[in-house]
């Protein structure tokens, strides 16, 4: 019996359509219900959770299979096997781009120009921490829940 975890949010509708096309309709009592079912004897449990959490839960063995973004697999450093890219993912339609951006009036032209202790805001703090560490830059990494660019230069340097 398989335990599945499917993404809530931007990948939700397309994931449900993918399952529908495979004659495995995902059914839940309301759009805010986190438990669902699929009428198939091979599938025992279906949960709908944030994509950020899915790789961790799959790597811990709480679920057998999950659908999430590659960005969250990398961010969480989860030990999972990626079986492929889905045609509706942002990797294929609107890729996530992680960039280092500074204020227009900044003297920095490259990461090497950033001063020790630079304040960096990111939706991917672990990937960002690794990126700066690999380049020998000591940075104060802060989690951002979106609109990271709006935090420069007052709340963060980049």
Segment roles from a protein language model:
Residues 1-158:
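Domain-level signature for soluble enzymes in the chorismate/prephenate branch of the shikimate pathway
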């Amino acid at each position: 019996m398989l335990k599945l975890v499917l993404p809530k949010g931007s990948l939700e509708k397309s994931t449900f359509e993918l399952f529908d096309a495979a004659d495995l309709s995902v059914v839940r009592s309301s759009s805010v219900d986190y438990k669902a079912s699929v009428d198939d004897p091979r599938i025992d449990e279906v949960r709908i959770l944030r994509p950020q959490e899915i790789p961790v839960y799959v790597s811990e063995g709480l679920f057998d299979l999950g659908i999430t973004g590659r960005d969250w697999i990398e961010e969480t450093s989860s030990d999972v096997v990626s079986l492929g890219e889905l045609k509706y993912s942002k990797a294929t339609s609107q890729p996530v781009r992680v960039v280092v951006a500074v204020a227009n009036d900044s003297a920095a032209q490259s990461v090497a120009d950033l001063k020790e202790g630079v304040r960096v805001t990111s939706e991917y703090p672990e990937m960002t921490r690794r990126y700066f560490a690999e380049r020998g830059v000591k940075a104060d990494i802060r989690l951002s829940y979106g609109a990271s660019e709006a935090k420069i230069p007052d709340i963060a340097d980049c």
